[in-house]
Amino acid sequence: MKRRKATLLAALAAGTTALLALGAATAGASAGTGHDPASRPLPDRVFAPYYEMYDTSTGLASLSQQSGARYLSLAFLQTAAPGSCTAYWDGDTSQPIAPSSYGSDIAVIQARGGNVIPSFGGYTADTTSTDIADSCTSVPAIAQVYESLITTYSVPRIDLDVEADSLANTAGIDRRNQAIAMTEAWAAAHHRRIEFSYTLPTFPSGLTSAGYAVLRNAVADGARIAAVNLLTFDYYLGTQQDMVADTESAADGLFTQLRSLYPAATARQLWHTIGITEMPGIDDFGPDETFSTADAVTIAHWAQRQGIGLISFWALQRDNGGCPGTKGAGTCSGVSQPDWYFSHVFEHFAN
């Protein structure tokens, strides 16, 4: 996702058999007490729209309350410069992984029964070698960053948004998956609960070959992945798209791809592993790729029927009708809508 730039895959391979760790795909299922937000698993269906960390004019807790979205995906974490092994929110050195950076807002969201899903990468990081796995060549150092995020904010899941140049960085892909496996082993040893998800670009037919290779490497490295989240927008195919049909066919394609990677998994497990991220209104391509208010209702019902585990969208700050006809706006959807329309529709999916 532009400057945007978002228990499966992570299956453990034993011999020639990949065993899928889904559902409670957690490292350390006995983790914690009920008083620790990290000890609470994510609900069976999660709605977690992206919050743009570079636009904090309205705080996390406030937008969560206004929109009704109990879970937020936080975009993004990245290094300040290539070669660094230190991650910051939006790559801003004044915003380290520390309680002083958004800790109070996250605690408020957790006290209300929700949580946040921090996301690494995104389009900007992935095109500037500042995604942590592209920037840092030490797998233990990458894992330590993941562990710090878990212990600092008590999060239930970490998302890894891999796009653009990062999809071709095979060394970075392998480091990332090794670091996931290392973090999961650390979590199990410390009786902590954690999940990892991948957010990947898609065609209407499913993952690109590069996206599929990311998951194949996860299996090889023994990394457990709880969700694969498809970016079902910005196709740039040059034709008018049926965004509902494209979402459904992309998910069908991913299902087939996952089944080939994880033949031991049930259909229900595979569908529950699939996540969908829409871009409400007019996306970056333009009016030919418009996700309408009616589309949102259709997708929410379809996702419930299919057993989809996650719905998200880009991004919470856009969930208003302030700029009808504008494509790819960062603060409004480009279509006429009531404030928080898409959030309310997709929150019903989660409930």
Describe the residue ranges of each PLM region:
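Chitinase-like catalytic core of GlcNAc-active glycosidases
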Residues: 34-230, 234-261, 269-275, 281-296, ...
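Beta-sheet entry/capping signal
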Residues: 115, 310-311
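Short, low-complexity, polybasic intrinsically disordered segments
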Residues: 289-310
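Residues that scaffold, gate, or flank divalent-cation-dependent active/transport sites
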Residues: 315
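A structural signal for short secondary-structure junctions
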Residues: 268-270, 305-306
